Amino acid sequence: CRGEGEIVHNDAKRGDIGNTSAMYARTFLTNMDCDAVTVAPYMGEDSVKPFVMEGKWVILLALTSNYGSSDFQNFPGNESAFDERHPEHDQLYKYVLKRSQKWGDHGNMMYVVGATRAEMLKEIRTIVPDHFLLVPGVGAQGGSLEEVVKYGMNKDVGLLINASRSILYASSGKDFADRAAREALSLQQQMGKFIS
C-alpha cells in the first residue's frame, strides 16, 4: 500500500531478450503496479521497449556510481567498437544516453547517473536536458550533493537524489527509526538549501 503521491520504484536492474523482458515488465509494472523499474540497457532496444509503458517510468543504467563502472561504461569508442552509424565514437555511457532516446522520451524514461561522477553531469545534461536523472551515491559512497545539484539540475530540477546506506545504516540499535528519519531529513534540508 502506498500513500497519495508516493512513487514505487523497483530497482530490479533487469535486461534480457525481448520476450523475457516483456514478462519482467508485466510483473513489475502491471502485476506489482510499480511506477518505475531500473533496466540495464546493454542488450539493446528489444530488451528495453517492453518497459516503456504509458504512465510508467523505465530508468536506464547509464553511468553508475560503483567502482567497477569504468570497466565498461567509460569505454572509449573507436571505429572497431562503434560503426559509421555513430561517427563520434563516444564512451559507452554517452552512446547509451543518445541511442536510447529513440526508445522513449523524457515523460517515460530517466537515467541512472552516479553522484560520484558529478563532474560529468554538465555534459550529460547537454545530451539529456529534459530527462530526470536518478542519482545514487550521495552519502556513504562519497558523492557531493552540492555538485550534483550544481551540474545536474535542469529547469524543472530533474533530479531524484538517492542516499541509501547513510539512511539504512544510520543505526543498528533501537533508535534506528529516529536516526534514519533524522538522516533523511538532514539530506532533504541540504537539498532544499542547494536548490533554492
Give the location of each predicted region.
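Generic structural signal for well-ordered alpha-helices
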Residues: A25, V48, L97, L121, ...
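Short acidic/glycine-rich loop or secondary-structure boundary segments that cap or lie
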Residues: D46-V48, Y67-F72, E119-E123, G142-S144, ...
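Conserved anion-binding
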Residues: A12, D16-V112, D130
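Alpha-helix-loop-beta-strand connector modules within alpha/beta enzyme cores
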Residues: C1-H9
